[in-house]
Amino acid sequence: MIVDVRNAAASAVAFLFVPLLAFAGAAEGEKKAAPCVACHGEAGNSVNPQWPSLAQQPAQFISTALFMFREGNRKNDLMTPMAKPLSNADMNDLAAYFSAQKAAQPKHQSKPENVAAGPGLAKKFNCSQCHGPRLLGQQHIPRLAGQQHEYVLAQLKAFKAQTRADIDGNMTSAAQALSPQDIEALADYVAGLSAE
């Protein structure tokens, strides 16, 4: 077997320094996150049911969402002007910071019938296929567990109405099968889940 020493050395250096870069990005992101706190809460834990929590969201999801707001692919009267001046480095720093924050325990109390029906609905509509088995998100796909109820409800309705864009079209497609009752039950269910 031939081993390319240069590639092995480069891999070792990357393995050692990538965590340091993420830490540096999180430190820079904390400085840049001051304006975000007004809506998204201290350390990214929103207390307003209409605005999403960013804490413990996958970094790639956060940076992708900011990019989509900046480029006009995703629209929001508050977020679009906030994202417009951000550089790619700013977005990555903010993403590193918020993804490193611990999500608060949800305050939302899901209805017992939705707690019972939620896992079956999540399986039926393939939520866990993309969002992960515990709905904690991965890569460019957001954490749903413990997210604000009203926010999730509004996003699911927007995907169904095709007024919200997503990067690969999967959510727009998946939402078409949801009834209004399914949307309410799923939003209520995921809002009560722990992000731990």
Regions found by a protein language model. Give the residues of each.
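Gly/Gly-Pro-rich "capping" loops immediately C-terminal to redox-active cysteine motifs
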Residues: G44-R74, T80-L86, P119, K123, ...
